[in-house]
């Protein structure tokens, strides 16, 4: 076989070019999948497998990215991730490098929101030079909101406190649900047709992304953009930002803030400053959108040459080795522990201490039996002594004395058996049970 002169690849070169091809062709992608084999080693990086019912792909999310994730991923969880395809060159495996991760439910809405925001920004609906100026002397405000919600109460309270001369026209509308966007569009059309107010305040209270979803509608965005009347969007809380906020001429963070923005009082200069800041913020947001679009192109071009990617791959390889090494060490430690326990048991069975313990127990048993035998023998001896004492007591002279008899002795101690053994003047001693009586013979 003739060897080709050109295009002879090494494995490293092949994997490197495959990586560049995949990263360059696909760019950033969104993926809806289930998490499995999730691992978070000490390096702070995350390694996981993303799968559906028919396929799976290895994935990595490095700690510089996963710090922004607001939840702890678990196996079996459905998520929506954004990332780019790459190749882990040491193994030749292709994998997904994750940049952002959301729970699947919130993630789909967030993805739709980002897609619509990019589309409308490209169409120029957020451009600062298209914003209508706020009237300088507002006499009548049109409020587009629910007639029974908390937002209208907050707005009326603020206007009454700051400038009671301002008239309010309420254009009641739905602010939540599938038909809310059409209802809001109709209210804007009605206000523009009547031309009875100086400015419109589009508002409602806070809620979840799903609750505020009607304000992220494309038709509503165009209706706000095409309105002849200037519009202030005051939807949700400080942290909530909707498409209507981007398209409106001015954005206020809350319904109360929107009412304060449009009402004049002694602090008019401060309000103008707040308006300027709000518009400046919108201009900055528009600038950020444009910058983000330009940076994506540069990011994709620089991504393949980024030294950080090489470092991340080395870190991933190190983490995998560490995970396998820890598993092997734990297995070895477990086996060694079992072996040590077995040897300890066998050694205990053969040790002198063990035998000494057994013999000591046997000695204790024999001692107990000996003590019981001695105790029994002593009891027998005691009983025999008691019997002998009783027998001796029955023949004792003292026993006779106890029955009223006495013993008489002369001075020498001799027992007198007859009166003939005495003479007049002799001293005799009569012994009774409880003492002695001395007498003189007459």
UniProtKB/Swiss-Prot annotation:
Broad class of where this protein is predominantly found: cytoplasm
Catalytic activity: Exonucleolytic cleavage in either 5'- to 3'- or 3'- to 5'-direction to yield nucleoside 5'-phosphates
Annotated Pfam families: Exonuc_VII_L, tRNA_anti_2
Source domain of life: Bacteria
EC number: 3.1.11.6
Cystine pairs: none
GO biological process, one term: DNA catabolic process
Transmembrane segments: none
One GO location term (cellular component): cytoplasm
UniProt subcellular location: Cytoplasm
The entry's keywords: Cytoplasm, Exonuclease, Hydrolase, Nuclease
InterPro entries per the UniProt record, alphabetical: Exonuc_VII_L (IPR003753), Exonuc_VII_lsu_C (IPR020579), OB-fold_nuc-bd_dom (IPR025824)
Keyword Protein transport attached: no
Any one GO molecular-function label of the UniProt entry: nucleic acid binding
Chain's role: Bidirectionally degrades single-stranded DNA into large acid-insoluble oligonucleotides, which are then degraded further into small acid-soluble oligonucleotides.
NCBIfam families named among the record's database cross-references: xseA
The protein's assembly and partners: Heterooligomer composed of large and small subunits.
Family note: Belongs to the XseA family.
Protein name, UniProt field: Exodeoxyribonuclease 7 large subunit
Upper lineage: Bacteria, Pseudomonadati, Pseudomonadota, Gammaproteobacteria, Alteromonadales
Underlying gene: xseA
């Amino acid at each position: 076989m003739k060897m080709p002169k050109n295009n002879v690849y090494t494995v490293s070169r092949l994997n490197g070019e495959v990586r560049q091809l995949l990263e360059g062709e696909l760019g950033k992608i969104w993926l809806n999948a289930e998490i499995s084999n999730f691992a978070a080693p000490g390096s702070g990086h995350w390694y996981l497998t993303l799968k559906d019912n028919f396929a799976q792909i290895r994935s990595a999310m490095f700690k510089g990215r996963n710090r922004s994730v607001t939840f702890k991923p678990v196996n079996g969880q459905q998520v929506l991730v954004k990332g780019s395809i790459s190749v882990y060159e040491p193994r030749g495996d292709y994998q997904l490098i994750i940049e952002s991760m959301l729970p699947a439910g919130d993630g789909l809405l967030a993805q739709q929101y980002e897609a619509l925001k990019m589309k409308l920004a490209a169409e120029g609906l957020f451009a600062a030079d298209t914003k209508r100026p706020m009237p300088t002397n507002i006499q009548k405000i049109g409020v587009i909101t629910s007639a029974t919600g908390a937002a209208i109460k907050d707005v009326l309270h603020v206007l009454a406190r700051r400038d009671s001369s301002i008239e309010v026209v309420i254009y009641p509308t739905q602010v939540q649900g599938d038909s809310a966007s059409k209802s809001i569009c109709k209210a804007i059309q009605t206000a523009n047709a009547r031309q009875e107010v100086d400015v419109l305040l589009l508002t409602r209270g806070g809620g979840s992304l799903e609750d505020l979803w009607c304000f992220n509608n494309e038709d509503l965005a165009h209706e706000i953009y095409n309105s002849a009347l200037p519009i202030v969007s005051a939807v949700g809380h400080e942290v909530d930002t909707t498409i209507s906020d981007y398209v409106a001429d001015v954005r206020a963070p809350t319904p109360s803030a929107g009412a304060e923005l449009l009402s004049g009082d002694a602090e008019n200069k401060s309000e103008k400053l707040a308006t300027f800041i709000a518009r400046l913020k919108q201009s900055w947001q528009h600038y950020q959108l444009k910058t983000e679009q330009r940076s994506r192109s540069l990011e994709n071009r620089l991504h393949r040459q980024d030294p950080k990617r090489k470092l991340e791959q080395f870190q991933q390889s190190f983490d995998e080795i560490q995970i396998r090494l820890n598993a092997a060490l734990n297995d070895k430690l477990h086996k060694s522990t079992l072996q040590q326990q077995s040897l300890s048991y066998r050694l205990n069975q053969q040790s002198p201490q063990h035998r000494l313990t057994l013999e000591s127990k046997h000695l204790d048993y024999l001692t107990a039996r000996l003590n019981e035998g001695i105790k029994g023998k002593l009891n027998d001896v005691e009983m025999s002594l008691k019997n002998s004492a009783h027998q001796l007591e029955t023949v004792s002279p003292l026993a006779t004395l106890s029955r009223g008899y006495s013993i008489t002795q002369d001075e020498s101690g001799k027992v007198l058996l007859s009166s003939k053994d005495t003479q007049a003047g002799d001293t005799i001693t009569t012994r009774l049970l409880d003492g002695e009586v001395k007498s003189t013979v007459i």
